[in-house]
Swiss-Prot record:
ATP binds at G12, P13, S14, G15, A16, G17, K18, G19, T20. This is Cytidylate kinase. SUPFAM superfamilies: P-loop containing nucleoside triphosphate hydrolases (SSF52540). It is found in: Cytoplasm. Its main location: cytoplasm. It is an enzyme of class 2 (transferase). It catalyses: CMP + ATP = CDP + ADP; dCMP + ATP = dCDP + ADP.
Length: 230
């Protein structure tokens, strides 16, 4: 496939800094943003809103094909705003109900295919930053501008620990580290769309470098690949 507009893919494991870098890149370049990790949760919430049964593959597929969702940047302190049918659902989609429902809708092959097409439709002028786990390998494999962010499991656990502590949650860092390692193993070894860098991706290890340096590396790569101002 070929994209209708410039696309930058940002893949990698949880906690590597994808979300932060994707938001900063979208703001710096004036590009649209796709948070693919939220897509299934958004679809699940849309199904709940429209009284679509979570075992109705045909209805879910139709809903997925016309999913009215936007990812809005511009408030770095609050992160990306997820808007479904004009309503801010950034907090709602993180509920356990949405999480459980997302797992159910993701089980249907036709729903996954419809959401794949829907994600590709985000590639519109002036450009797109696509944040996910298989953006460069499955969703936008032909874009020349691919980034893969990674960091040690220990560093990612520490970042997650700090985030949860800041939000008032009482968490155990050893448990977080164990969960991250288990998810890494599951994601990297699954048979469908495993978490691996695209062959032509720029791999950035964010373990020991600050966000400004990561951003500089990313912008330089994008400038070289897409010929856009860095």
């Amino acid at each position: 496939m070929s994209e209708r507009a410039p696309v930058v893919t940002v893949d990698g494991p949880s906690g590597a800094g994808k979300g932060t870098i994707s938001q900063l890149l979208a703001e710096r370049l004036g590009y649209k943003l796709l948070d693919s990790g939220a897509i299934y949760r958004v679809l699940a919430l849309a199904a709940i809103h429209h009284n679509v049964e979570l075992d109705n593959e045909e209805a879910l597929t139709l809903l997925a094909a016309h999913l009215d969702v936007q990812f809005v940047t511009g408030n770095e302190s609050k992160g990306i705003k997820v808007v479904l049918e004009g309503e801010d659902v950034s907090i709602t989609i993180r509920s356990q109900e949405c999480s459980n429902a997302a797992s159910k809708v993701a089980a249907f092959p036709r729903v996954r295919e419809a959401l794949l097409r829907r994600q590709r439709a985000f590639a519109e002028a002036p450009g797109l930053i696509a944040d996910g786990r298989d953006m460069g390998t499955i969703v936008f494999p032909t874009t020349p501008a691919k980034l893969y962010l990674t960091a040690s499991a220990e560093e990612r656990a520490q970042r997650r620990y700090n985030q949860l502590q800041d939000k008032g949650f009482d968490v155990n860092i050893d448990q977080l580290l164990s969960e991250i390692k288990e998810r890494d193993d599951r994601d990297m070894n699954r048979s469908v769309a495993p978490l691996v860098p695209a062959e032509d991706a720029l791999i950035i290890d964010t373990t020991n470098i600050n966000i400004e340096d990561v951003l500089d590396l990313a912008l330089t790569h994008i400038h070289q690949k897409l010929q856009v101002p860095a």
